[in-house]
């Protein structure tokens, strides 16, 4: 009740001030348009005396502006205490227009007294403009009281609530990757840093095509790893985009290594610019489990649907058969013919010869018992189906160029050997991805096993477009390689792509064991998963209730997503969200970031222009300078076929002449021999 009385009292005071303001306007018109009033026969003597006294004592009418200023002051005071009904459609532009128009009409009309009309007409025009100006000023004042003081629609995307302070200090160590950034907090742009101080806890770089993941992140990983003396394995899906960067960075940073590293390339498309390497080098195959790993990797890369069916009979059978052949080539003549092309050619020989030879070795006899049971039991259809499951996919890899690259020994795959460090770039081709990925997957699986050892040089494995290749053991490498100083960086587009090509279980392990994550624009479940990973932040919520008498504002706080999935789905190119892992003694308070990674485009363009091409490794020229590449590759292809034929001939002869092994020869062959 008391409040209502106070409000009524305030309203009366405001009305009184407005009345005073109007009085000033009226006496202003009466004084300065006095001649027009006299001509009209209007003459108020008492008022004249009062106004003359004001003029003598205060000089109230000595200038046109004095009474006008007083009128405006009292008008403003009356408007300050007025509470109008709030209107959401009211805008400052509308208020400013009325206010400025009112000022012009109210104060800038003195010249109307000099118009070439009669005093009465001049006074009428002056009064009309003065009144119009006053009304506009009054309207602007009333409209101000109707304006909402809090416009809740100023930040429609909730950007201010979802901005947060990020790391602004550079934290470097001998292994770190550091990326400069810019981010917005409290309406101001800040310079920041993404400090990956523990690269050995693995990194994932996500983003749809064109989001900038290679340009902003992967390229920087390559440059900074080489500048800090890491051995490097680089899977270059679109060869030679990344390999050229690695080669030129090595040329610039050769002095950062204690032992000068060698640069090697595996490139099936261009044998001139490719080294040769045997991924199943017998030196690094200790037992038959190594052969199984190689067979497993190659066949799952050729048949990615098998990844979801691991353990099935028609998946395991061809893997075991190929593993037996690889191990046989390893133990035959101490691995002289232990190459993958020899294994493919051996597999494509008659299965009667294959099983006769393989089962003549005690170490393989039990390994192949399921096949022998089917053979001896007359289940020829089943046996042929098992063999065809291996033959058909592997036949896609029969290529002279691929045979050439995979049968040489230019280098070994122990990349982080402190005495012989290496930087290896392997190139794929999107047009031949299904074939090359299988061969490259074999290199990958051997490298994972060889680099993950103690006492080796710090090393980095960078895989761009991970789902294009089945990298067996990558989940285990992420989980165990930290103590062996192996830094893993995986680039791909989204989690669902990884799940499709690696299976749900393995994909989940990769997602959940990685310590550092970068994400450009991603959508769907990937964006939701990342949003949950980044957690929630305390955000302010404000609401306004409007009625005729009053406006009430309520403010509350609640936990909400720090970086919502919708924000992640609409990130600009080069803008990334993510989190980093820290170390003991190198703690990072704010591990999460949402920032634009700064790349000096002009500097990068200048560097790229100055880059040297990867040199030709093998000229394939004879003494006269003629190009003999095709002939040399074909000779190698023919030699492998001849080697396998000779192996089978020698082995069958050995078995036939050994009384303890003669029983292995198929009955049909024995009958032919007797004839």
Describe the predicted segments one by one.
Residues 1-211, 215, 220, 228, ...:
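Basic- and hydrophobic-enriched, low-structure N-terminal and domain-boundary segments
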Residues 28, 39-43, 149, 153, ...:
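P-loop NTPase motor domains
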Residues 55-58, 339-343, 407, 545-549:
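Short, surface-exposed recognition loops or helix-turn segments adjacent to catalytic cores
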Residues 169-189, 368-381, 516, 522-523:
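N-terminal short leaders/motifs
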Residues 176-178, 425, 575-579, 592-594:
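Ordered hydrophobic segments in well-structured contexts
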Residues 183-189, 303-313, 541-558, 587:
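Low-complexity, polar-biased intrinsically disordered regions enriched in Pro/Ser/Thr/Gly
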Residues 478-480, 484-487, 491-581:
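Conserved ATP-driven motor cores of ASCE-family P-loop NTPases powering translocation/secretion/packaging/pilus
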């Amino acid at each position: 009740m008391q409040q209502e009385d106070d409000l009524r009292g305030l309203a009366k005071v405001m009305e009184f001030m407005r009345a005073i303001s109007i009085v000033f306007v009226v006496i202003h018109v009466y004084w300065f348009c006095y001649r027009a009033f006299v001509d009209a026969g209007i003459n108020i003597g008492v008022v004249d005396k009062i106004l003359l006294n004001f003029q003598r004592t205060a000089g109230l009418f000595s200038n046109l502006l004095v009474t006008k200023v007083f009128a405006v002051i009292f008008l403003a005071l009356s408007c300050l205490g007025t509470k109008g009904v709030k209107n959401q459609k009211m805008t400052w532009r509308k208020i400013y227009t009325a206010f400025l128009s009112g000022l012009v009409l109210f104060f800038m009309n003195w010249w109307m007294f000099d118009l070439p009309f009669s005093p009465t007409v001049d006074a009428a025009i002056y009064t009309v403009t003065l009144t119009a100006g006053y009304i506009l000023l009054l309207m602007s004042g009333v409209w101000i009281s109707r304006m909402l003081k809090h416009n809740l629609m100023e930040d429609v995307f909730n950007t201010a609530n979802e901005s947060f302070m990020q790391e602004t200090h550079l934290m470097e160590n001998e292994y770190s990757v550091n990326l400069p950034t810019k981010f917005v907090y409290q309406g101001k742009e800040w310079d920041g840093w993404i400090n990956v101080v523990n690269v050995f806890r693995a990194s994932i770089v996500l983003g749809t095509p064109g989001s900038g993941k290679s340009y902003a992140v992967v390229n920087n990983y390559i440059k900074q790893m080489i500048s800090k003396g890491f051995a490097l394995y680089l899977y270059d899906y679109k060869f030679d985009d990344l390999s050229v960067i690695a080669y030129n960075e090595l040329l610039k940073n050769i002095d950062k290594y204690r032992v000068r590293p060698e640069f090697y390339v595996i490139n099936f498309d261009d044998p001139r610019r490719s080294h040769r390497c045997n991924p199943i080098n017998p030196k690094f195959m200790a037992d038959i489990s190594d052969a199984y790993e190689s067979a497993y990797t190659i066949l799952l890369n050729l048949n990615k649907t098998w990844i979801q069916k691991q353990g099935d009979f028609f998946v395991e059978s061809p893997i075991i058969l190929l593993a037996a052949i690889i191990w046989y080539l390893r133990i035959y003549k101490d691995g002289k013919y232990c190459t993958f092309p020899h294994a493919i050619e051996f597999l494509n020989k008659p299965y009667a010869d294959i099983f006769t030879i393989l089962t003549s070795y005690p170490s393989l006899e039990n390994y192949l018992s399921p096949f022998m049971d089917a053979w001896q039991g007359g289940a020829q259809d089943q046996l042929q189906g098992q063999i065809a499951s291996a033959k058909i996919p592997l036949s896609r890899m029969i290529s002279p160029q691929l045979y050439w690259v995979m049968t040489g020994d230019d280098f070994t795959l122990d990349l982080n050997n402190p005495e012989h460090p290496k930087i290896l770039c392997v190139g794929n081709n999107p047009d031949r991805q299904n074939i090359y990925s299988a061969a490259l997957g074999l290199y990958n699986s051997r490298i994972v096993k060889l680099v993950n050892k103690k006492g080796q040089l710090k090393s980095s494995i960078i895989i761009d477009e991970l789902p294009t290749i089945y990298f067996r053991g990558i989940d285990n490498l992420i989980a165990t390689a930290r103590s062996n100083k192996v830094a893993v960086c995986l680039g791909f587009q989204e989690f669902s792509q990884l799940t499709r090509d690696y299976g749900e279980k393995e994909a989940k392990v990769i997602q959940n064991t990685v310590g550092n994550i970068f994400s450009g624009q991603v959508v769907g479940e990937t964006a939701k998963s990342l949003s949950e990973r980044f957690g929630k932040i305390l955000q302010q919520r404000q609401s306004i209730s409007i009625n005729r008498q009053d406006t009430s504002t309520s403010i509350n706080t609640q936990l909400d997503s720090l970086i919502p999935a919708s924000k992640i789905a609409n990130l600009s190119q080069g803008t990334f969200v993510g989190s980093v892992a820290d170390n003991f003694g190198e703690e990072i308070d704010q591990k999460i970031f949402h920032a634009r990674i700064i790349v000096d485009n002009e500097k990068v363009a200048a560097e790229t222009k100055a880059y040297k091409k990867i040199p030709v490794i093998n000229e394939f020229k004879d003494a006269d300078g003629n190009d003999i590449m095709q002939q040399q590759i074909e000779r190698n292809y023919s030699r492998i076929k001849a080697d396998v034929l000779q192996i089978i001939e020698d082995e069958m002869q050995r078995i036939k002449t050994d009384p303890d092994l003669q029983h292995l020869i198929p009955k049909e062959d024995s009958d032919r021999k007797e004839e």
